[in-house]
A protein has these predicted regions:
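Acidic, polar-rich low-complexity tracts and alpha-helical solenoid repeat scaffolds
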Residues: 2-282
């Protein structure tokens, strides 16, 4: 019996090593066949996790989502194997691209919790942040953004994304003071899209609070700084006209609207916002 077992385990290793050699040569299609054959011949084989991992990677290379989901799914049945972090990443990414955000979120949360490197931990948190934002789950967004912002090495782009989504979540939760703190940090750089929108939102917060002087100051400062993101500058011009109406400076309000009407060319909702306000100012 011992001999039979020994022969079988030798056969197991030889079959696996042969498949791995083909893969290492960069021959994905025959390697895929060999790994698949290996798993069929040795279902619980000593190298079955490795084979599932390689089939996952080949599936990703060949843009075969079903293969990635199948083999990553198999790897995830063994929670603490050496491939589980990569499996969570690949599995989560496909679910995210398929707009199955709740399922992707679960993968990213596991990755965030068990990641062995800061980079993987960040990838998990970014996944949770983006899924949470798309699902309008403010608590998930706030937790993930806060975890990201506590990271020692975070790129400026990711810092901005985390601040932006956290600010939006705080606004939804009526946590205006916390939202304002995040928005004001973002608004320091209006060259970025998040910064330009944040600058507008800071002014909007002042306007909604009835603090018209601060709203006016914020917008005039935005006009001075300028931004490549013309839409948010235009929205700020419109907000400035609302501020002037509230301050009973209707003439100024009208002038800003007319100037915007002449200078703003894009085909979006700005024109209708201008017309709606000009109607009321007649």
């Amino acid at each position: 019996l011992g001999d039979v077992y020994k022969r079988q385990s030798e056969q197991d290793s030889l079959t696996y090593i042969a498949a791995e050699k083909i893969y290492m040569k960069g021959e994905s299609a025959p390697a895929k066949e060999s790994f698949t054959r290996y798993l069929q011949s040795f279902p619980g084989g000593a190298f079955s996790l490795n084979a599932h991992y390689y089939l996952c990677v080949i599936g990703k290379e060949q843009k075969d989502d079903e293969a990635v989901l199948e083999h990553a799914g198999k790897l995830l049945e063994y929670p603490d194997n050496p491939y589980s972090e990569e499996a969570l990443l690949m599995h989560g990414e496909i679910l995210f691209n398929r707009q199955q955000y709740a399922l992707a979120l679960a993968d990213y949360k596991k990755l965030q919790a068990k990641a062995t490197t800061a980079e993987r931990r960040q990838l998990g948190a970014i996944g949770v942040l983006r899924c949470g934002a798309l699902m309008h789950d403010d608590a998930e967004v706030i937790n993930a953004a806060t975890a990201l912002l506590a990271e020692a090495k975070l790129s400026p782009e990711l810092r901005n994304e985390a601040l932006y989504y956290r600010a939006k979540a705080y606004l939804n939760q009526k946590a205006d003071k916390k939202a304002m703190d995040d928005l004001q940090l973002l608004a320091k750089d209006t060259r970025t899209l998040y910064g330009a929108e944040a600058k507008y939102l800071v002014a909007l917060q002042w306007y909604n609070a009835g603090n018209y002087a601060s709203a006016e100051k914020e917008i005039l400062n935005f006009i001075d700084q300028s931004t490549p993101h013309a839409y948010w500058l235009a929205r700020s011009f419109i907000l400035l006209s609302d501020v002037y109406v509230a301050m009973d400076k209707k003439l100024d309000a009208r002038q800003y609207l007319l100037s915007l009407q002449q200078n703003y060319q894009a085909d979006d909702d700005i024109a209708s916002m201008i017309n709606e306000r000009l109607e009321k100012l007649k």
